Amino acid sequence: FVKEKKLDVGFAYDGDADRCIAVDENGKVIDGDLILYICGKYLMEQGRLEGNTIVTTVMSNLGLYKACDKIGMKYEQTAVGDKYVYENMLKNGYILGGEQSGHIIFSKHARTGDGILTSLLIMEVILEKKQSLGTLAGEVKIYPQLLKNVRVTDKKTARENPAVQEAVQKAAD
């Protein structure tokens, strides 16, 4: 629709509008990871990103972390769930966190995801930087990603297993 109507940006919300996914001028989906990067970088440049840190979950894409590293933006990972993201933000005084799913929390304004607030901040970034959403998102190279649950009988043993740790590190490199 965005591409067909030659719009600059589009927004999609879930049923209660606590999640927001954007669509750029080329019809590309801009998920929560990209939104975190775009908003985090903007707030950091303005000196408004507490600790220059965003809070993400373990499901975030490696490309987000590499892009953050490149610009000096820090990040903390939590378990999946906006509850855990918010707990970390509250504990450490961070103001921006979220999930790939589009749950984005701006703790100065809300304690949970707010899709309308998210879309307003995205619009602020686009207008203030005078750049398209596609250009802003283009700084992040999203890597192929497979999310798969693996059942184990003892999570602690699996996590501490050297072979598992080596495989995870190899995949991250």
Predicted regions: what they are:
Residues 18-37:
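Short Gly/Thr/Asp-enriched flexible loops that form oxyanion-binding sites at enzyme active sites
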Residues 1-4, 32-34, 95-101:
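Short, structured secondary-structure boundary patches
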Residues 14-16, 26, 59, 101:
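Anionic group-transfer/hydrolysis microenvironments
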Residues 1-23:
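N-terminal small/polar loop signature for handling phosphorylated ligands or for N-terminal nucleophile
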Residues 3, 41-44, 172:
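Generic structural signal for well-ordered alpha-helical scaffold segments
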Residues 9, 46-173:
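Phosphate-binding and adjacent anionic-ligand microenvironments
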Residues 31-39, 60, 118:
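Short acidic-hydrophobic sequence patches enriched in Asp/Glu that either
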Residues 34-50:
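Structural motif
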